[in-house]
């Protein structure tokens, strides 16, 4: 049992709590015997939902939490005053090593504040970024940052690139991942002040495989494995991605139902088409890890259904087994030392 990856799940956060978080947790433990889930929230409500399912009882626990942080609440006040909320209780589980990860679709602000103040940042990390996987032509890329730091500095973006590279190599399995910075052109002199200042720092960084600037239209083509940007740009890209994906799926389904011929054709291509459209479904990729913390915190969409919870829980396995926080701390410390040595002329 000690080898199991322990994941706490906020059963009270999000638009469809507790139904979808509980269902997703059950699907996760049924899908992979390496994971154990602790459902955090109101006991009677969670127990009622669990009665619907068959699952290995020894790998699902309930952790009591009587309070709920609502989306509209000021995050700092909510974290400070609602000590028995599902988010605070779950975060403390990570902080004290009682679980390996925490997954929540609750208030984004509360998750960001709780991650930094309760779980805590890794030594050397300036700003923890949110980093979701997004689909590309041949696989996935990591979009970093997509919502945590709207006023980032060049040093923050450099750290995002390094943390993103570690994640893609050790969790996703892409060796020597390519890092690109989002820009309005591919030329080195293009961009706003932030991009222009960040570019040379990324170019000279020996810990990443920097491929230069990438335009937004090249992101779906897989121009980079790690797509670096500040949070405002990243959030716009993410929301556009999700909107286009949902629209594409809807339009294809509509087109297949327009005539008898199209319906027959749809039946012939259904298996391949279903698999292709599945790649545009955001829930297939799980939530966005808040990288740079001492433990793993994953933020899922507020509208997450069971499938996204399941995939978010399962992505915690590789993160935990590969000891990502330790790798991040080591790489950042080495980078800092090399920068200081260069300044001293060593």
Regions found by a protein language model. Give the residues of each.
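N-terminal charge/polar-biased segments
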Residues: 1-9, 15-19, 47-48, 53, ...
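Glycine-rich phosphate/diphosphate-binding loop of Rossmann-like nucleotide-binding domains
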Residues: 19-20, 32, 36-38, 43-47, ...
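N-terminal glycine-rich anion-binding loop in soluble enzyme alpha/beta folds
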Residues: 20-71
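Glycine-rich phosphate/nucleotide-binding loop
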Residues: 116-129, 133-143, 223-227, 231-341
